[in-house]
């Protein structure tokens, strides 16, 4: 069997490197999806992921020029007095379990109203006036454009006589699916969505192939919406079949071995369910390829999902021989259930492998054996083995015990080996075991960095993995089953990794917990306590923050003598499930405390100071930004707050946010209301306070985090903050764009240029 592979196309965290991203907020990084042989292609400008997506890097600091080794790129701008009108106040008072809470900008939740659109247009115009006036933008654009031309490539996957993979060349907006017959065969483009829209706003969301490679299913969506339409193409000829199935977001397609049909997940059509539920009620269906009257899938039988909750997330998978159907049901980011069924038994029923406990399980089937990776009573994960004939929990046998390191992502059966990816202090490692759990080899990693994919299945005679680090773009390695690695493809760039130093530092958080952080800068940089620095973090949804190439365009900052800092906060997966749970629900404040402590460490150890420290976060990381700049407005000069959650009392009422209640809680519950109200950024803006300069960035077709968060927070802060014109509160709402996944290179470049123009202006970088 082959697991589902998740990659954020811009970046399973808005997710760099597969963070899913609310990350991949909808996609679950530790997907136990069996032989789905599906690639959720959310390429990588990001890193996770998470999911990722995009994560633009930026931040700002002192308006006075920094005189160290910064070369001329952008100058400070005198914005002059602002004529931007204040937003209308219309207080709505809610009663939360006896607590009266005012909301002065409820009307800005309606993104379709003429008044809201006028507000947005005025804000965008004001933001453009300021950012377009930053000197040196053309130089920034030129360099950032060259950095984005680095491109990307995925690991190849073998399917019958074919190898399939994606690659994005430097100037392309979206990745292209390539196929070749044999590993050394001539490649040809199979699916190129760049031809579908000149501006690149039709995205390749995911793709999936069967064991014989006859057909490939893939999803596309417009304007970053991620509301995929499922298509099928014939691999040998490139002929597009008539199938066109709507509402197939992250469809987790599982092909029958003969490619006569596939299982998949989809969402209901609008009008078929009560309004507001169209983005929930994900269920599993089966589509037969032989029925020309059913190309839209509307006659496809429901296979699984009756009786599930509105926010349960169901996926199907198949063993490589197609004999066993596996259903995985996620309930939040801490729990799933796994069921298995013998498809050859006409009287077969689903058998539960799991027993309803609050753990995660990831399943692989090879032959008649099941391999289960789980954090059951093992926060850093372990591996069990069971027979398909007796799959119940009581019959499992542990073959890889918990260790000091974290089993990352999912273990994979490739050939007659078990490949185990690890995290060691937030850096990737890879080991090869026998199918009985005996270690055969550790695969040497090129440097400290991150695995970005693992290709192969139980019938393969070889494997592939991708690797990336902060200053080194992705390289794909071919791997023998005994652990010998050679380069298969590498992405070239003009960045010399030898010029930069990556160090990992540890510091104490508020409660004494030791927290790590990567710090990247030019070799030989003299630390005088005033170096412009960008600090970024995520800290949520069991997603790891690990090294990725040029995250957020940070190479630009390094080239100008600055520092990039990447902190591994509680709430993530860097140190297992305990680390995750220490930063969720009633313990979410730990995430914010960790980030604040990271900033204080950088200042105390002479990396930077308050006037030269900028911070950046997106999605769940945008919530992080809102929490820390409302709790410690004195600590930062500038903030990039991207696609953020900010009104935590009402977040669950918009888009897909009910899926996140297991991570955050809900104000509808009296106890959980107390947790959320204690830190909800929208409810902690204090009138007369001087805040950092802030650039809120959001998009009109974001189907994960509603733009209302950024609109309301902008209006509130512009009215309340005592900032001068040199510390503006800005809103930038992009059009024909979403949460980040699938954002075309052209739009990514515009995001980067605005972000870094803002940062360099605020940091005083010349």
Q: Where would I find each of the regions flagged by the language model?
A:
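Short hydrophobic alpha-helical segments enriched in small aliphatic residues
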Residues: 3-6, 15-18, 36
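Positively charged n-region of N-terminal signal peptides that target proteins for export
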Residues: 43-50
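Beta-propeller folds
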Residues: 53-435, 439-462, 468-474, 478-482, ...
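Glycine-rich His-Gly loop
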Residues: 168, 375, 468, 536-540, ...
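Cap/lid segment of the alpha/beta-hydrolase catalytic domain
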Residues: 194-210, 218-225, 239-242, 481-484, ...
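Active-site-proximal cap/loop segments of hydrolase catalytic domains
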Residues: 553, 566-766
């Amino acid at each position: 069997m082959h697991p589902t592979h998740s990659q954020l196309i811009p970046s399973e965290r808005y997710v760099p490197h597969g963070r899913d991203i609310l990350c991949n907020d909808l996609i679950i990084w530790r997907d136990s999806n069996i032989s789905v042989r599906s690639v959720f292609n959310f390429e990588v400008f990001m890193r996770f992921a998470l999911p990722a997506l995009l994560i633009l890097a930026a931040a700002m600091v002192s308006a006075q020029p920094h005189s160290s080794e910064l070369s001329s790129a952008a100058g400070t701008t005198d914005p002059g007095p602002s004529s931007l009108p204040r937003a209308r106040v219309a207080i709505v008072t809610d009663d939360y379990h006896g607590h009266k809470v005012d909301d002065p900008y409820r009307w800005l939740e309606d993104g379709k109203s003429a008044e809201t659109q006028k507000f947005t247009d005025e804000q965008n115009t004001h933001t453009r006036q300021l950012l377009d006036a930053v000197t040196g933008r053309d130089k920034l654009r030129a360099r950032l454009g060259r950095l984005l031309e680095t491109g990307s490539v995925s690991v190849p996957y073998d399917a019958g006589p074919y190898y399939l993979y994606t690659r994005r060349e430097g100037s392309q907006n979206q990745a292209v699916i390539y196929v070749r017959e044999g590993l050394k065969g001539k490649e040809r483009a199979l699916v190129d969505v760049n031809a579908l829209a000149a501006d690149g706003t039709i995205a390749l969301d995911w793709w999936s192939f069967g064991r014989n490679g006859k057909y490939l299913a893939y999803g596309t969506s417009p304007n970053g919406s991620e509301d995929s339409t499922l298509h099928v193409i014939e691999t040998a000829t490139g002929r597009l079949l008539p199938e066109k199935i709507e509402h197939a977001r992250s469809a987790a397609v599982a092909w029958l071995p003969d490619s006569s049909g596939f299982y998949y997940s989809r969402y209901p059509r609008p009008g078929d369910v009560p309004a507001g539920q169209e983005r929930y009620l994900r269920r599993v269906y089966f589509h037969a390829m032989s029925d020309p009257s059913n190309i839209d899938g509307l006659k496809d039988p429901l296979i699984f999902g009756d009786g599930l909750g509105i926010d349960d997330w169901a996926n199907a998978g198949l063993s490589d021989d197609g004999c066993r159907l596996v259903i995985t049901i996620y309930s939040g980011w801490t729990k799933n259930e796994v069921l298995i069924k013998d498809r050859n038994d006409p009287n077969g029923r689903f058998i539960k492998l799991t027993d309803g406990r609050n753990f995660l399980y990831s399943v692989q089937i090879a032959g008649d054996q099941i391999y289960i990776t789980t954090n059951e009573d093992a926060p850093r994960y372990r591996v069990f083995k069971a027979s398909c004939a007796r799959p119940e929990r009581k019959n499992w046998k542990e073959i890889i015990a918990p260790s000091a390191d974290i089993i990352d992502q999912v273990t994979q059966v490739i050939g007659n080996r078990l490949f185990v990816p690890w995290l060691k202090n937030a850096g990737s490692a890879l080991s090869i075991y026998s199918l009985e759990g005996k270690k055969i080899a550790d695969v040497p990693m090129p440097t400290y960095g991150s695995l970005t994919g693992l290709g192969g299945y139980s019938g393969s005679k070889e494997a592939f993995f991708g690797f990336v680090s902060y200053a080194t773009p992705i390289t794909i390695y071919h791997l023998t089953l005994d652990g010998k690695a050679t380069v298969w493809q590498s992405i070239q760039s003009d960045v010399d990794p030898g010029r930069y130093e990556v160090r990992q530092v540890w510091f104490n958080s508020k409660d004494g917990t030791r927290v790590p952080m990567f710090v990247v800068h030019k070799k030989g940089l003299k630390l005088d306590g005033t170096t412009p620095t960008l600090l970024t973090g995520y800290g949520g949804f069991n997603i790891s923050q690990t090294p990725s190439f040029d995250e957020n365009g940070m190479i630009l900052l390094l080239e100008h003598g600055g520092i990039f800092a990447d902190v591994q906060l509680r709430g993530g997966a860097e140190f297992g499930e305990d680390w995750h749970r220490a930063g969720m629900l009633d313990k979410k404040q730990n995430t914010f405390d960790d980030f604040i402590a990271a900033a204080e460490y950088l200042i105390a150890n002479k990396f930077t100071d308050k006037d030269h420290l900028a911070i950046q976060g997106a999605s769940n990381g945008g919530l992080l930004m809102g929490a820390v700049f409302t709790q410690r407005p004195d600590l930062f000069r500038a903030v990039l707050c991207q696609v953020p959650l900010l009104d935590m009392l009402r977040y669950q009422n918009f888009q897909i946010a009910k899926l996140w209640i297991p991570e955050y809680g809900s104000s509808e519950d009296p106890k959980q209301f107390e947790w959320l109200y204690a830190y909800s950024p929208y409810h902690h803006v204090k009138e007369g306070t001087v805040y950092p300069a802030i650039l809120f960035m959001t998009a009109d077709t974001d189907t994960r985090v509603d733009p209302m968060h950024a609109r309301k927070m902008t209006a509130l802060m512009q009215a309340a903050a005592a900032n001068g014109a040199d510390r503006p509160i800005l809103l930038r709402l992009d059009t024909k764009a979403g949460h980040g996944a699938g954002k075309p290179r052209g739009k990514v470049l515009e995001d980067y240029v605005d972000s870094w123009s803002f940062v360099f202006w605020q940091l005083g970088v010349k």
